[in-house]
Amino acid sequence: MNKQRFVVIDVETTGNSPKKGDKIIQIAAVVIENGQITERFSKYINPNKSIPAFIEQLTGISNQMVENEQPFEAVAEEVFQLLDGAYFVAHNIHFDLGFVKYELHKAGFQLPDCEVLDTVELSRIVFPGFEGYKLTELSEELQLRHDQPHRADSDAEVTGLIFLEILEKLRQLPYPTLKQLRRLSQHFISDLTHLLDMFINENRHTEIPGYTRFSSFSVREPEAIDVRINEDENFSFEIESWEAGNEKALSELMPGYEKRDGQMMMMREVADAFANREHALIEAPPGIGKTIGYLIPAALFAKKSKKPVIISTYSTLLQQQILTKDLPIVQDLFPFPVTAAILKGQSHYLCLYKFEQVLHEEDDNYDAVLTKAQLLVWLTETNTGDVAELNLPSGGKLLWDRLAYDDDSYKRSRSEHVIGFYERAKQIAMRSDLVITNHSLLLTDEGSHKKRLPESGTFIIDEAHHFERAASEHLGKRATYIELHTKLSRIGTLKEQGLLKKMRQLFQRNSLPVDSFFELEEWLQHVQAESDAFFSSVHSFVKRRKPKEDLNRLVFKVNKESQDKSWSILTDGAERLCSMLTHLQQLFEAQSSLMEKHLKGMKSKTVFLADEYQRSMKGLQHYCQTLQKLFFGSDDDEAVWIEIDAKGAKNAVAIYAQPLEPGELLADQFFARKNSVVLTSATLTVEGSFQFMIERLGLSDFFPRTMRIESPFSYDERMQVMIPKEMKSIQDTGQPEFIQDTARYIELMAKEKQPKILVLFTSHDMLKKVHQELKHNMSASGIQLLAQGITGGSPGKLMKTFKTSNQAILLGTNHFWEGVDFPGDELTTVMIVRLPFRSPDHPLHAAKCELARKKGKNPFQTVSLPEAVLTFRQGIGRLLRSAGDKGTIIILDRRIKTAGYGRLFLDALPTTSVSEMTDSELEAYVAGEKE
């Protein structure tokens, strides 16, 4: 290390391509020697061309700042000398290296033959769980100051500090991990080999505590599993006794705690439902401390009954929040340990045995190699093996499918020293008082003979407004072109490096007959060709029936009316495809018996290959069964539909089926088998009644307890609701004018001081058009415009960017109507563009309406309207999440005042402070807020 010299470079430029005439406007460097920064260099450069406005806005570097500076040629020799004999380090190396190399060459200098290190790549490897790898994100994660992002001197400084953190992290890795990283390093962008050799030599004879060996790599030494401890026999497990002595303790544990009557009411209601073996629905608004409100009675009941309580959520985010934020508070309120565990489905957990096999496969795919490197480092840190802890590249997600735990993993992955992650998670769950899971696993477990969750009769369903949807998705079926294509690609051909070629070589080595592989290859090619033709036909079929819709995503409902001559051509295609897949399965079964007979007891690498081949073939069989059910096995109590990417590939098709009334199945297969299920959410009622939700969930025959807790917030003082009088309806003006008006009102609200505006849409197509209207003006105003599905990143990343921005507008659809929290100043205004009615063309919704009609009910009153009111309440609930929050709601849909049903939406508002305003009144309000 003492002899290593690293030069960290950052450049600001007029654009992205030096070959197209873009120029450097600032260059900065920090020199690192002996583990510390020893020198700094920074120069503004005259590009001899105008700096574009957006670059000036991004960097803060203006034409005036560089007009009297020297051109790059004047500093070229100094830069050359700086880099001579050093590593070239940069954040996104190709960008900075490309510009420096080009400018040096123009100035008559050849870039020194130096090795390169990319801190984006290295950060991904050594910090595999970080949320993002931009300089600002890394600075935040590593708690480094980054005062002026997009200034070369500030960026180079923070890149240097990040690089020092990377070196230190590499130095601390155990010897086996470093050895495996060394083997992969030839595929990295960074020239890491010599550095890894140095760290390997340092660690060769060092036994670093806290790790254990699994085959060729190291894993973190697992923590001891907690054992249930017998409680004090004199302790009273009744909620009243607990409540009397713990209010003071709660106030000490929770900053800003105020006595919450609603929380205490909820505790008593949950405790009574458990004690009386009853089901219950509890509507708990923001601010009452809902999670604590059910965790305390759940912990008391689990201790008293000596059986776990299962807590199920819809989102993984809430699972983690319960375990890390709320549970520690609860644990501190008892004189004995309250144990808890998160348990997810098998596919969330890494199978160590599979990883060992895949790690040693030769792989030229960059994302796959990067993922292997990330996993090697992560295994020295993780206690759970849960993929949710990782930030994998897109190709890494495909690799994970090969590495995830499955039913065969247990018999393959047993080790003398290391328990598999999934077995460990199950063991912890079996010994816990509270088990936190998700709706999907809960429903899977109920329908399976092979139980994953511990036996329990007592459940809490949080985010219960999603429970019916989760059941519908779980009980439904789906077949896509991409799914079949991925399965076929994994098997491959005898010419490609897929499973088929490897298995033929394996059969040859073991003197087994290989003729079946040639026939299999022929039929696999037939299946690929038939699937291409079939899904292209489905795509064309849907496009012909939706010729006027200018949407990217087209949806077509399959029913008896649609089954004409063209439809019969599709069913013939589906039948042919299923017949070919069935024949493939028959050919495979002949091979399977040979494998069973001759490949048992072989080396683990051989067994792994055979297992993966069998899984892939079984995957085709399962796909065939699903396709058959979708086309030939659906019945009247299901909705079947097709979705296509109209502007995408000609076979970009997905076919779905979901039950219309999952509540009936929930009643028979879940609620009837449980002692007590408490369902809770902030939105379970319509017009103050639980009846809609009771019917939807199949609870009518169980006569559940219900409780609606009043909000602790004084909404009249904290929430202003405004309805613009001059906003015209889309029916009166048409969509183009409605889009323009929507953009105009967003711009009006953006004039407030430090605007943080969430705009909720019901259509992504409309969102895109409004974004197009806003884009130019928002860019000029300096307000950050974020749009779901347009500005890049997942909803989670958009949320984070929005939260950390001083001034921002976020345009969102479905995801942002619920389940996102923006406390305090993170959100000032929520704008609702249209009341959130489901599209009447959506097949599942249309089928539910048709079913209601057949039962003699009004589908609008019994299906569409209650669903829309619940979603509306969720959207309104984004604004005030904690005590002290204030904000404004703008509703642009005039139907809330003009339609007869508008009263239900007005009644759903938690405030009476509702005003209709002219544009001038609205402008005056915004101006007043700004002062």
From Swiss-Prot:
Residues 741-897 form the Helicase C-terminal domain. One of its GO terms (biological process) is DNA replication. Its EC number is 3.1.-.-. SMART domains: DEXDc, EXOIII, HELICc2. Gene3D superfamilies: P-loop containing nucleotide triphosphate hydrolases, Ribonuclease H-like superfamily/Ribonuclease H. GO terms for cellular component: cytoplasm. Keywords: ATP-binding, Cytoplasm, Exonuclease, Hydrolase, Nuclease, Nucleotide-binding. GO terms for molecular function: 3'-5' exonuclease activity; ATP binding; DNA binding; DNA helicase activity; DNA-directed DNA polymerase activity; hydrolase activity, acting on acid anhydrides, in phosphorus-containing anhydrides. It is an enzyme of class 3 (hydrolase). ATP binds at residues 284-291. Disruption phenotype: Cells are marginally sensitive to methyl methanesulfonate (MMS) and sensitive to H2O2. It is found in: Cytoplasm. A motif (DEAH box) lies at residues 462-465. Transmembrane segments: none annotated. Residues 250-510 form the Helicase ATP-binding domain. It holds the Pfam family RNase_T. Residues 7-162 form the Exonuclease domain. Belongs to the helicase family. DinG subfamily. Type 2 sub-subfamily. 3'-5' exonuclease. This is 3'-5' exonuclease DinG. It comes from Bacillus subtilis (strain 168).
